[in-house]
């Protein structure tokens, strides 16, 4: 259905729209709805989460395939490009990690970051992540004959990189929960962290550099740009002066510190 929607949209607006993106932050729905259970339907079900994530991935790949076909037929603007935008979060752990802590980092990175990077840059999913999910955790991903050919079509022209916060993890207390579903990690509280208390998000400007360099190293042929980065603050009227100007020096500092790290990449 989504692939058909994309095809119709491109046929209607292909002569006007030059830059297309299949999804913005496709990781959010499977994580928030089914992994963490904080959005409707408020379920904590890793199997459901990974299969929703897998189906969104296929939808992305089919959308890219439709774009390529229409472009080859001359139905899109000259120089038209297609990409994906995702919120990436570089994972970190303790200063002296155990092998179990490093495994939590690997799978957190694999499911949240590398899953999407491998598809958009290389046209496949990370095999080590699939092996862990299906062989070690015994969670079935509903893969069908022909899916690999669909995934191979998922490579994009460029990537949008949203960055707000890192992910800090350590080994979970147990490998499986009371329902027999895998526990990927548990949060690690870095003693030196600086927080945006209004969002509950850590402010870590170096993370935008670390992940940008990861993209350059692992996907050297994939152009990317910073598509989102900023600081959300609730109730900013309390920082408003007598002239009606919000004195948001905290936001200026946030943007400045991130730009300094971007300049080093």
For the regions a language model picked out, list residue spans one by one.
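Active-site region of glycoside hydrolase catalytic domains
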Residues: 1-265
């Amino acid at each position: 259905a989504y692939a058909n929607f994309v095809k119709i949209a491109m046929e209607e607006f292909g002569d006007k729209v030059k830059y297309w993106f299949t999804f913005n932050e496709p990781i959010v729905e499977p994580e928030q709805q089914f992994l963490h259970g904080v959005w409707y339907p408020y379920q904590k079900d890793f199997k459901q989460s990974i299969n929703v994530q897998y189906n969104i991935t296929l939808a992305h790949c089919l959308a890219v395939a439709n774009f390529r076909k229409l472009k080859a037929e001359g139905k899109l603007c000259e120089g038209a490009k297609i990409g994906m935008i995702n919120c990436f979060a570089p994972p970190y752990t303790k200063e002296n990690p155990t092998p179990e802590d490093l495994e939590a980092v690997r799978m957190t990175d694999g499911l949240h970051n590398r899953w999407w990077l491998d598809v958009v840059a290389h046209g496949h999913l990370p095999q080590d992540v699939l092996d862990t999910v299906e062989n070690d955790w015994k969670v079935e991903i509903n893969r069908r004959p022909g899916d690999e050919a669909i995934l191979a079509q998922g490579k994009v022209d460029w990537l949008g990189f949203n960055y707000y916060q890192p992910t800090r993890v350590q080994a979970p207390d147990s490998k499986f929960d009371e329902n027999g579903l895998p526990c990927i990690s548990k949060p690690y509280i870095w003693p030196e962290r600086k927080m945006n208390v209004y969002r509950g998000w850590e402010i870590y400007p170096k993370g935008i550099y670390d992940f940008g360099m990861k993209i350059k190293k692992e996907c050297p042929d994939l152009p990317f740009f910073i598509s989102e980065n900023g600081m959300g603050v609730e109730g900013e009227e309390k920082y408003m002066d007598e002239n009606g100007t919000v004195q948001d020096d905290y936001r200026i500092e946030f943007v400045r510190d991130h730009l300094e790290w971007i300049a080093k990449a």
